[in-house]
């Protein structure tokens, strides 16, 4: 009968229904049908009386917690029994929980007493699925997790860092070098998070240090307050406002956090586009604090992953490798400020304005606050104020409309009362309108984000701060607007993008920035998905216009290689050409080579030759690039970004984690090279791995890549579900089974075999290592040298001392099971 040994137990288990059954042992092809113990398989959904740790699903949605659930005896059957606290964690309404109070059994409620609730227990996964009417559950959005299930993580510390180095050597003149770094360090304790931003820059001339700057733009403490759907921040921070300009301050703030709510309007972040003329470094900053930095190759670039919490003016700087610098500003005004009916969103802060780095300024104490109230289904009222104990006050009021098929629209008016240095107190007004509309039928998006007109006497808080500290280089804004339009024409496979931003000033010349981009994919014979793009842009900064026209054609060469040609014309009508080859056939190693120059440079063999290489590891990302132009210059650039996280359970270097993101530490109990989340992270020699950039307030499943485990390693809990709060360091310990496998036959002292279906467990850890099949056959995994294995059935038990790995032979091992009764 040995040929059926491996299949029969599976068939038996699969026949179990949701009710108690008694197996017909005559159907079992076993040598001794009476010597069979299938009690643990006879009732699906039942467990012996006791308490068990289970993962849970509610209406097919996995919850991010394990519950210690009780099984109690009711009508000669066991049933799951849930405490009121556990019902709250599972998301049941207060009304339902109150109704169960009259029928508690030893402090818990057998939920299957409710005819509309069904449960299913997967014993193999130790997972309980609960199906309940949606009306009995508080939360109806499948993409959001309620506060009761949020995880604040564990105590720990981290460092997220970005390192840059460059060397520029002209054919004539001095060499220059630069070393820079920016990032964030943090410490977590419970729900509290301590954070400090840092930025370091050192320049050299012929190897001699010229200037060194080290700043800590922000040092602050924050924590989520779930009961208020808000975040509390204490320290050096920036005001967060959809009405007023942002400024740096030291003090305390409280802000409602949209991410704690079910999905709704969750803010807006701008897309920054531009054209780099060489290998360039793009820096986005606000209030002199670096927000984003990236190396980009020559040609158009787009930055689309800025945080949606950014408000106000953003400064963009493009530093070309030959020393040229281009600067402009981008507004990050929010789309119309709408709130669902009956809800209030708010932010408030108080303290004293400071410069970046915390330098003391001669500034007044201030308080600022704003709100948005959902008055009607499609109408929101909003407003705010900035109040000081000196000569500046500002008030704002506005209304936002959801016009349904016509889009979204808002209007607001802001009044300022300010007395600037050596001037009389003046009252000024600023008027603003926002509009956004997506045309579903055509797939186009129109955003008129922020027409604003300010009279000459209107003063912002930033302007008042600058004037009080005798900074005279600020501009008195008169009018500004931003328009963006995006349209995809499916029939032509053509995408269009247009953006226009205009600013005028009372005391300075105006500037207009605009960009037009057309892109299309098409096929040429055997060449599929050939991509072309045409981009025209104008950047106006301090009365200097920079016009650029860029044409690019990219031809895919297979699935991971690209041949490209680009043509660029600048404001002086100079035309340059670039030919490049990009190869990403290795997911962790990509490289490119290119040649660029104008017609004369190619003719004289003086085109610029560039090469770049990027290497992705579990511990960070390395980027190298170099450029050389004969008789002109050469340059070298290098960057590395990564993170380091430490807790009481261990520490690990890992891939870069954004400062606003959470992270998750996996403890594999000392087992190295466990791949996590599709090899996004791997455990180190101490068994510790960190998965970076885990979303906050969203149920996230983190997994072990079980197909690529090291030899002789098994993982029981290969999927971990969690919902982390902002900035949390999550933690889970894997049930790692490390050891060798044994295929054998268990024999008792009298030559018989243990009953079919008995578990074989490690005597020390009590982990199940296998099940007894027909004729005592067993497959065991996770065996360690000198393990002692135990089998128990009824009032009987026996123990196995398996052979050590060094004594294993091929074939089936005989495993004597010795009774110690």
Curated annotation (Swiss-Prot):
Membrane topology: Multi-pass membrane protein
SUPFAM superfamilies: FimD N-terminal domain-like
Cysteine pairs bridged by disulfides in the record: 798-817
Keyword Signal assigned: yes
GO molecular function: fimbrial usher porin activity
Keyword entries, A-Z: Cell outer membrane, Disulfide bond, Fimbrium biogenesis, Membrane, Signal, Transmembrane, Transmembrane beta strand, Transport
GO biological-process terms attached to the record: pilus assembly
Pfam families (alphabetical): PapC_C (PF13953), PapC_N (PF13954), Usher (PF00577)
CC per GO annotation: cell outer membrane
Leader sequence residues: 1-20
Disrupted-gene phenotype: Loss of H(2) production on minimal glucose and complex glucose but not on complex formate medium. Alters production of organic acids when grown on minimal glucose medium. This phenotype was complemented by reintroduction of the yqiG gene.
Chief location bin: membrane
Record family assignment: Belongs to the fimbrial export usher family.
Function: May be involved in H(2) production during fermentative growth. Involved in the export and assembly of a fimbrial subunit across the outer membrane.
This protein's name: Putative outer membrane usher protein YqiG
Source organism per UniProt: Escherichia coli (strain K12)
Gene responsible for this protein: yqiG
